[in-house]
């Protein structure tokens, strides 16, 4: 999905803008090193601040960037102060609202499980929204760290955030007698073209990544310091 963000960003900025693209693989130590060595003549720093571990002090290094040059993308970072641009997801509310929209389909299941690796760059706000929804609507619920070892039973819905976990889940499901969308439900984070086809269509919950890139570019072009929350969408398909 980062490629989709980048494409929207580049298309909106136009061909007369030079972009240096740095990949830090969600490694905070590498991120800190890259930012420390970055050229001072950049007009802007557009940062996607997701870290697998060690990012608790990310605000300290980000706060060294002049505010008029800073745009945070996908996630806001507590402790980053001053006036700067941001285009972000509201992770807690997004999953809560998406599941609420799917209540009719979820009603035939009794248990919701979210596959969330212990070491993940995905924000814990996702788990807060998931737990809040399940508690308010009386679903049995569980956070699963390793889907390869998790018992799978009829009446359960599985929500994945990592693509690798979706592959493992599907590999297990196709060997079982359960019918997807009847006995077992599947919801996947982040819309892709393939999810329209796999299992006759996988239900997705996803932000508009292209729009995220477009809005970030518009902040640069306009010089605005707005904080823009990107819409989040539920796409219902046969897997639920």
Predicted features along the sequence, with ranges:
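An alpha-beta-alpha
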Residues: 94-135, 228-240
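Periplasmic-binding protein-like
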Residues: 42-51, 71, 113-117, 154-163, ...
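Flexible loop/hinge segments that line or gate small-molecule binding clefts
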Residues: 49-93, 190-200
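Flexible loop/turn connectors
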Residues: 152-154, 164-240
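Amphipathic helical "hinge" segments at domain boundaries
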Residues: 1-37, 41-43
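Short, solvent-exposed amphipathic alpha-helices that sit
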Residues: 2-15, 94-101, 121-139, 168, ...
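Hydrophobic alpha-helical segments within soluble ligand-binding/sensing domains
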Residues: 53, 76-113, 166, 206-225
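Short beta-strand elements in bilobed, periplasmic/extracellular small-molecule ligand-binding domains
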Residues: 13-25, 82-85, 111-114, 127, ...
């Amino acid at each position: 999905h980062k490629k989709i963000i980048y494409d929207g960003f580049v298309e909106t900025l136009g061909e007369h803008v030079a972009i240096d693209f740095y990949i830090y693989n969600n490694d905070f130590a590498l991120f800190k090193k890259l930012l420390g060595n970055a050229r001072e003549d950049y007009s802007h720093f557009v940062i996607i601040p997701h870290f697998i571990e060690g990012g608790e002090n990310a605000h300290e290094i980000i706060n060294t960037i002049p505010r008029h040059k800073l745009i945070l993308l996908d996630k806001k970072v507590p402790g980053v102060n001053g006036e700067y641009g941001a285009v972000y997801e509201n992770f807690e509310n997004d999953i809560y609202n998406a599941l609420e929209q799917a209540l009719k389909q979820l009603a035939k299941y009794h248990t919701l499980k979210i596959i969330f690796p212990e070491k993940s760059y995905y924000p814990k706000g996702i788990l807060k929204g998931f737990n809040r929804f399940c508690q308010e609507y009386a679903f049995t619920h569980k956070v699963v760290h390793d889907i390869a070892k998790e018992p799978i039973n009829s009446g359960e819905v599985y929500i994945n955030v990592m693509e690798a976990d979706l592959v493992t889940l599907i590999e297990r499901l196709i060997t079982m007698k359960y019918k997807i969308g009847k006995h077992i439900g599947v919801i996947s984070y982040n819309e892709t073209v393939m999810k329209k086809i796999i299992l006759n269509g996988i239900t997705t919950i996803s932000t508009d990544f292209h729009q995220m890139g477009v809005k970030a570019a518009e902040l640069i072009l306009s010089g605005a310091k707005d904080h823009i929350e990107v819409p989040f969408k539920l796409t219902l398909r046969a897997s639920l």
